[in-house]
A protein has these predicted regions:
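Short, surface-exposed alpha-helical segments at coil->helix boundaries
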Residues: 15-22, 41-44, 158-162
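Short hydrophobic segments within beta-strands
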Residues: 6-11, 64, 88, 148
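Catalytic nucleophile-loop/oxyanion-hole region of alpha/beta-hydrolase
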Residues: 32-55
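The alpha/beta-hydrolase serine catalytic core
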Residues: 82-201
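Aromatic pocket-lining residues of Rossmann-like dinucleotide-binding sites
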Residues: 76-77
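Gly/Ala-rich beta-loop-alpha elbow adjacent to hydrolase catalytic centers
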Residues: 64-73
Length: 211
């Protein structure tokens, strides 16, 4: 086949999840990205190598990315030859997300700077290095993208996703009462229908490119 679709899973996911998307891309090879990176600076090193090992065997490549997998893709693959992207509940503003988590955990920036890492009661580890990286590496994304967002996403506010959509000329589909994690039968049905709909859409205009 001439085209590959690379699936990039989110936290706690795995490359095998790519199997779900194969029926929608019958004319493509759907490949799960089997990565080990846990931080964006690790993804910055690992993702281009994995991507290029796949891309060299195809004429075109598209990407499906989930949650933090989308953030890693934006951070690490923005300069790659990707024809189109499909983002599911993407994390598009890591600095904002970390700041929100600091509020939830009642942690000040000075405390985080001093301790470097703080374990929260909700299972996440706040990292000073992570916050600094997010600030020092603002995302730039110019690849035609379709985004699926749950109305009740607890990690990314609507205003944040809307700003990203406007800035990148992406399309946005919102599931009423949808969550960050699409996993129920109803949510997966909505996701599948979104994929089908997105496949029929064509970006008429190119995303605004920075000089």
């Amino acid at each position: 086949m001439d085209k590959a679709v690379i699936y990039i899973h989110g936290k706690g996911g795995n490359a095998e999840e790519a199997i779900h998307y194969k029926p929608f891309f019958s004319n493509c090879d759907v490949i799960g990205l089997d990565y080990t990176a846990q931080f964006p600076w690790e993804a910055k090193e690992e993702f281009p190598l994995l991507f290029n090992s796949i891309y060299r065997n195809y004429k075109t490549v598209e990407v499906i990315a989930n949650s933090i997998g989308a953030y890693f893709a934006i951070n690490a693959l923005s300069n790659q030859q990707i024809e189109k992207a499909y983002f599911i509940s993407p994390v598009v503003d890591m600095e904002r997300l970390i700041a929100d988590m600091m509020i939830w955990a009642n942690v000040t920036e000075d405390e985080l700077k001093e301790k470097k890492e703080i374990q929260t009661t909700f299972g996440e580890t706040l990292s000073w290095d992570y916050l600094c990286y997010a600030r020092e590496n603002p995302i730039i994304w110019e690849i035609p993208t379709h985004i699926l967002y749950g109305e009740k996403d607890n990690l990314t506010a609507y205003g944040t996703i809307f700003e990203f959509v406007q800035r990148t000329n992406s399309t946005l589909s919102i599931m009423k009462n949808g969550e960050h994690w699409f996993h129920t039968d109803e949510q997966m049905k909505f996701l599948d229908e979104w994929i089908i709909k997105s496949l029929s859409l064509i970006h008429i205009s190119e995303p605004t490119r920075r000089s």
